[in-house]
A protein has these predicted regions:
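Beta-strand-centric surfaces of beta-sandwich/beta-rich domains
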Residues: 1-132
Length: 132
């Protein structure tokens, strides 16, 4: 990564799931047109309330699968639980090498509820905009 042509940037994806185990929801994220995006880390929250996650070191309220609809590639072989993919704000998942997405890449996130709680999910993709 070239620091002269990159800016720290965060994309967010949100979804709400009903209080039924197995309930699903999806959200689409289209990357901005002015730059590539290098994904460096993922953080997430998804409990019924902030307090339901604050005291949990490795929360596990939902699973998610991510598909790059621009290329037709899945970013994982199946749904991945929150605690494996994202952890929480104190224990985020960091990529060893950045994953680069082209401008206007279209990502589909499919979420599944793992608890009998209403989940309001926010997934944050931390990385760098690489200005073209």
């Amino acid at each position: 990564m070239d620091n002269t042509n990159s800016l720290p940037f965060v994309y967010t994806v949100t979804s709400s799931l009903t209080n039924v185990v197995g309930a699903t929801g999806s959200s689409t994220l289209i990357m901005q047109a002015d730059s590539r995006f290098e994904l460096m880390g993922i953080m997430a929250t998804g409990g019924a309330t902030a307090a339901s996650e604050d005291n949990i070191q490795y929360p596990n309220f939902f699973s998610v699968s991510i598909r790059d609809q621009t290329t037709g590639r899945d970013l994982m072989s199946g749904p991945v639980p929150q605690r494996v993919l994202a952890g929480n704000a104190f224990r985020q998942f960091l990529e060893k090498r950045g994953i680069i997405f082209e401008p206007q890449s279209n990502l589909l996130f499919t979420f599944t509820n793992l608890q009998a709680l209403t989940c309001n999910i926010t997934l944050a993709l931390h990385g760098y905009k690489m200005i073209l």
